[in-house]
């Protein structure tokens, strides 16, 4: 949609139409809501001043990219947002050349812009990268690594700091407080402009040195001093919902031909009163009633997250040395209950996974028992810290990995597929997974008493109810759930246990089912005994096949020179998994029990 010839009035009408479209579709389909409503005028300004098909448009995380999708030939297709086979909820170059880069994890945008700007300079192209980044993403260290180089190179990059004073959760830390202070002094920029005019008008040519020194001294009260001292110009704060001001400011920033931060104040949920000013409830939503804002809730069993949260709270009440941390996901990981109950022992450190892990390593060294509550996909962001600061020291840190396996509508950037693969080869690390609510509760007590670093994984949503009385967790010990007479053996890990049980129920043979429990260390004694009885082994796990559960067992069979076992692993193949309803995604991968039973002859 070309909007460059539209009048201001037409643009304002379009902003209303965009909001209406987002509210209508998201109310029926679900999706990221309040952040994207707050970014409508900023997005229109970007499209008016820049060219989305030429200038690199880079949306950090891209929770706020829905208006951009609607402006780039996806208005009708927007009905399919986050649905299986439909539009992604994030920017995705496969969808449109207007989507410069895949996004989903935070704080990558400015680094991408630096790389794009370097390339533009080398290729002698007339383009300017334009970034939209939220105040929540500004808490991550990668942002300042990028700003550090950008300020040094003086490359032309325009960065819109979309400051709604809310990330997904309540904003945390000194950076957030700094930005809030800037907003509190929002009239600074006009004051500075008046002083600049006074200097130019009243100081003769020979006093430019004095004028320069005055300007340097003036920076001491500049709200953007943090950025200006890094060599990046700062404009703002501006009203991010005033289209005229947004467009004029972006035109100025583009013409400056150097790095510029445009600090825009916006309201999260703008245009839908019920959502305005809400931190978490309206960030990512399911279907809701537009008239009253009531969510259309389906009856659902207690989620694994809720079970974990209650169990960790009980553990914290029992043991005073239990502490915990999350990286900007207190509600998503369930640690919010503990932050309310024990604010001196549980922290949200904002989007700072590396810091979260290393700081908890120090607490473990001091005798505390840290629980790092984190989504599987975000644990990737602290990989070096896991090795260098936790496992090398063999410190008893517990990584509680939520959203392990397929996560549904968030898609390929958020699937919890890789944690087993990248944790399994680290010395000292213990990996285990509960199969249901009862074993999840048990696993936390076990983790507390373990003197090694360990990682527990559990899925998004609820475990399937299983009718097995759990035995106590013992390090490196599996559990036989059912003994059959077939020469086949089903081994499940974590949520994969229920898939093994369901597949066995559909099969015409009486098959033994084992809950592996530990992928590291393996129960080698039991596996050795099982290899004497069963020749065809089938592995069920919600994880990547490469270096996954099947690989661990194959390594064991090879090391023990066991050659009579034929092993088949039902894990994720070597490709990224698309978004959509979990059952539809599993069906596309051939992982439903009714599909698996056809593969087991």
UniProtKB/Swiss-Prot annotation:
- SMART domains recorded: Transket_pyr (SM00861)
| Presence of keyword Transferase | yes
GO annotations under biological process?
1-deoxy-D-xylulose 5-phosphate biosynthetic process; isopentenyl diphosphate biosynthetic process, methylerythritol 4-phosphate pathway; terpenoid biosynthetic process; thiamine biosynthetic process
What Gene3D superfamilies does the database record attribute to this sequence?
3.40.50.920, 3.40.50.970
One MF term in the entry's GO annotations = thiamine pyrophosphate binding
Q: What domain of life does the UniProt record list for this protein's source?
A: Bacteria
> Which cofactors is this protein said to need?
Mg(2+); thiamine diphosphate
**Stored InterPro entries:** Dxylulose-5-P_synthase (IPR005477), THDP-binding (IPR029061), Transketo_C/PFOR_II (IPR009014), Transketolase-like_Pyr-bd (IPR005475), Transketolase_BS (IPR020826), Transketolase_C (IPR033248), Transketolase_CS (IPR049557)
Where along this sequence does the record place binding of thiamine diphosphate? 63, 104-106, 136-137, 164, 272, 353
Which HAMAP family does the UniProt entry name for this protein? DXP_synth
The subunit field of the Swiss-Prot or TrEMBL record says: Homodimer.
NCBIfam families per record: dxs (TIGR00204), PRK05444.2-2 (NF003933)
> Which family does the record assign?
Belongs to the transketolase family. DXPS subfamily.
Record protein name field: 1-deoxy-D-xylulose-5-phosphate synthase
Q: Which organism is it from?
A: Aliarcobacter butzleri (strain RM4018) (Arcobacter butzleri)
């Amino acid at each position: 949609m070309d909007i460059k010839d539209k009048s201001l009035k037409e643009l304002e009408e379009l902003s209303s139409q965009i909001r209406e479209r987002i509210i209508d579709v998201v109310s029926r389909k679900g999706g990221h809501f309040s952040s994207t409503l707050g970014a409508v005028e900023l997005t229109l300004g970007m499209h008016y001043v820049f060219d989305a098909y030429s200038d690199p448009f880079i949306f950090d995380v891209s929770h706020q990219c829905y208006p951009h999708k609607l402006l780039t030939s996806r208005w009708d297709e927007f009905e399919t947002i986050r649905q299986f086979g439909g539009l992604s909820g994030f920017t995705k170059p496969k969808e449109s050349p207007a989507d410069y880069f895949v996004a989903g994890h935070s704080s990558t945008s400015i680094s991408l812009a630096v790389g794009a700007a370097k390339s533009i300079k080398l290729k002698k192209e007339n383009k300017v990268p334009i970034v939209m980044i939220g105040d929540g993403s500004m808490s991550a260290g990668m942002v300042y690594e990028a700003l550090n180089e950008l300020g040094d190179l003086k490359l032309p990059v325009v960065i819109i700091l979309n400051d709604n004073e809310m990330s997904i959760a309540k904003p945390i830390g000194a950076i957030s407080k700094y930005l809030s202070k800037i907003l509190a002094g929002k009239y600074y920029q006009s004051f500075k402009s008046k002083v600049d005019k006074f200097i130019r008008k009243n100081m003769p040519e020979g006093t430019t040195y004095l004028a320069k020194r005055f300007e340097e001294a003036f920076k001491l009260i500049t709200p953007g001093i943090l950025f200006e001292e890094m060599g990046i110009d700062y404009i703002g704060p501006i009203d991010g919902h005033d289209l005229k001001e947004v467009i004029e400011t972006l035109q100025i920033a583009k013409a400056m031909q150097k790095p510029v931060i445009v600090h825009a104040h916006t309201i999260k949920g703008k245009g839908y009163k019920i959502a305005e000013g809400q931190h978490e409830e309206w960030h990512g939503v399911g279907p809701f009633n537009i008239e009253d804002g009531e969510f259309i809730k389906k009856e659902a069993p207690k989620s694994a997250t809720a079970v974990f949260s209650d169990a960790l709270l009980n553990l914290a009440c029992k043991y005073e040395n239990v502490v915990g941390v999350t990286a900007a996901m207190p509600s998503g990981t369930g640690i919010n209950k503990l932050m309310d109950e024990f604010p001196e022992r549980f922290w949200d450190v904002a989007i700072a996974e590396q810091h979260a892990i290393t700081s908890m390593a120090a607490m473990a060294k001091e005798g505390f028992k840290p629980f790092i509550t984190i989504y599987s996909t975000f644990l990737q962001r602290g990989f070096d810290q896991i090795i260098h600061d936790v496992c090398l020291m063999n410190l008893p840190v517990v990584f509680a990995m939520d959203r392990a396996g397929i996560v549904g509508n968030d898609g390929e950037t958020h699937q919890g597929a890789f944690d087993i693969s990248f944790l399994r080869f680290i010395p000292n690390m213990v990996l285990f997974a509960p199969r249901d609510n009862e074993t999840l509760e048990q696993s936390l007590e076990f983790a507390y008493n373990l003197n090694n670093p360990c990682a527990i994984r559990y899925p998004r949503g609820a475990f399937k109810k299983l009718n097995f009385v759990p035995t106590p967790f013992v390090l490196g010990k599996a559990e036989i759930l059912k003994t059959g007479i077939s020469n086949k053996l089903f081994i499940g890990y974590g949520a994969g246990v229920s898939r093994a049980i369901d597949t066995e129920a559909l099969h015409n043979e009486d098959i033994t089912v084992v809950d592996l429990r530990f992928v590291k260390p393996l129960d080698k004694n039991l596996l050795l005994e099982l290899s004497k009885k069963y020749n065809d082994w089938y592995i069920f796990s919600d994880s990547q096949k490469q270096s996954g559960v099947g690989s661990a067992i194959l390594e064991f069979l090879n090391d023990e020179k066991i050659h009579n076992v034929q092993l088949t692993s039902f894990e994720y193949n070597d490709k990224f998994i698309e978004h959509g309803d979990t059952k539809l995604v599993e069906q596309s991968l051939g992982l439903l029990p009714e599909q698996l039973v056809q593969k087991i002859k």
